[in-house]
Amino acid sequence: MTVRTRFAPSPTGFLHVGGVRTALFSWLYAKHHNGQFILRIEDTDRERSTQESVQAILDGMAWLGLNFDEGPYYQTERYARYQQVAQQLLKEGKAYRCQCSKERLEALREAQLAAKEKPRYDGHCRNQTLPDSGVPYVIRFRNPDAGIVSFHDEVYGDIHVDNSELDDLILVRSDGHPTYNFAVVIDDWDMKITHVIRGDDHINNTPRQINLFKALDAPVPVFAHLPMILGEDGKRLSKRHGAVSVLQFKELGVLPHALLNYLVRLGWSHGDQEIFSVQEMITSFDLKNVSRGVSSFNYDKLYWLNQHYQKSDSPESVANALQWHFEQAGIDLNQGPDLKDLVAVQAERCKSLAEMCQISQYFYTDTIEYNEDAVKKHLRPVVLEPLMVLHERLKALDEWKNDKIQECINDVSLQFDLNLGKIAQPLRVAVTGSGTSPSIDMTLALLGKNKSIKRLEDALEKIRARASAV
């Protein structure tokens, strides 16, 4: 048997982390078993489905590297197939037309609630022969009257539901459009899906869908339902907790494999291992180690993983991802150091690519923004003479290299009997605008001689102006 899994999002909003984890688990299960992963867009909600959301799903999957073997298939392109199966079920007596009005159904619901009964359709049209006479109708499934629906969920174990608890669900609405539970069964059947991995909000749909599979003499897939992801406050993850859309994490500067590594550990474990390459995920993944408990999304843990990959990945690969952030900020990368050289000195100083971009822009701009507190603290008249001497020493350098730069700084600090920090920190503020940067020799080396000298000259003017104002 060839394992075939699917990811079937509805394009009614962004691709959120819960959906991404479902996609990841489905993708990993298929890859682990040398199977196939199918993408299906469940776009039957015509009012809420948008092409923009479809594109966000495709872009998010591409960014994460969750490539699909087939698809994307669109439910709206399969309406003829749903009608064909509905007519087949009608012909076989496994479905029936229902002409109950909205008013009757609402009155039925209110009466059942008043009697403290579970609201459900009472089968009013079940045994009537209603011709297609032009009166609006829905098509309902003739659910078995008796017996028990039993299935083994790969996460939750054995589940049993009495058919008496299930009413006759609607398959096709009066406007001819299929319902979710009907379309998804036909799709999984036609697409030969062997394993349905999805959120546990669908677990109540499963007995109904199993009955439909059996009515169609279709093979019933294996089901695995994943517990939901909560925020750290124990509430369902939402926008108030921060980023929840996969492409928002790209904007925040999270590397795609860092997000995958984090998500795979939300509800799944492989011993005590925390760090997984994508290949290690594929090799190790199984469903038996998926937890039944809910997971909490912890941003600190995600950024810890992200920083790990920033430091352990090759500077070239991190630079490729970082480039997008500089482009979004409108920074001309031709005006500064090679990005891979920047990554080599900044990766361990930042938790994200967005932060790396933000604190590194002074390497690529002609002008810098000064932190006024840093200026007041370090660009004081007392350092004017040492910085003037350092300026001349640096300007005279033939080789603009780390060791030569550091040698100049050391010599000037000795000449004026200053602690190294007393000269390095004013120099740092002079060339970066702030009191934090990589090592001062590396900072100047990456900036280049011309920028470093020009900024030091600008800082000397600031100090002279400050001295004359005293």
UniProtKB/Swiss-Prot annotation:
CDD domains: GluRS_core. It catalyses: tRNA(Glu) + L-glutamate + ATP = L-glutamyl-tRNA(Glu) + AMP + diphosphate. Monomer. It is an enzyme of class 6 (ligase). HAMAP family: Glu_tRNA_synth_type1 (MF_00022). Catalyzes the attachment of glutamate to tRNA(Glu) in a two-step reaction: glutamate is first activated by ATP to form Glu-AMP and then transferred to the acceptor end of tRNA(Glu). A motif ('KMSKS' region) lies at residues 236-240. SUPFAM superfamilies: An anticodon-binding domain of class I aminoacyl-tRNA synthetases (SSF48163), Nucleotidylyl transferase (SSF52374). Its main location: cytoplasm. It comes from the Bacteria. This is Glutamate--tRNA ligase. One of its GO terms (cellular component) is cytosol. It comes from Legionella pneumophila (strain Corby). It is found in: Cytoplasm. Keywords: Aminoacyl-tRNA synthetase, ATP-binding, Cytoplasm, Ligase, Nucleotide-binding, Protein biosynthesis. The keyword Zinc does not apply. GO terms for biological process: glutamyl-tRNA aminoacylation. Its EC number is 6.1.1.17. GO terms for molecular function: ATP binding; glutamate-tRNA ligase activity; tRNA binding; zinc ion binding. InterPro entries: aa-tRNA-synth_I_cd-bd, aa-tRNA-synth_I_codon-bd_sub2, aa-tRNA-synth_I_CS, aa_tRNA-synth_I_cd-bd_sf, Glu-tRNA-ligase_bac/mito, Glu/Gln-tRNA-synth, Glu/Gln-tRNA-synth_Ib_cat-dom, GluQ/Sye. Belongs to the class-I aminoacyl-tRNA synthetase family. Glutamate--tRNA ligase type 1 subfamily. ATP binds at K239. A motif ('HIGH' region) lies at residues 9-19.
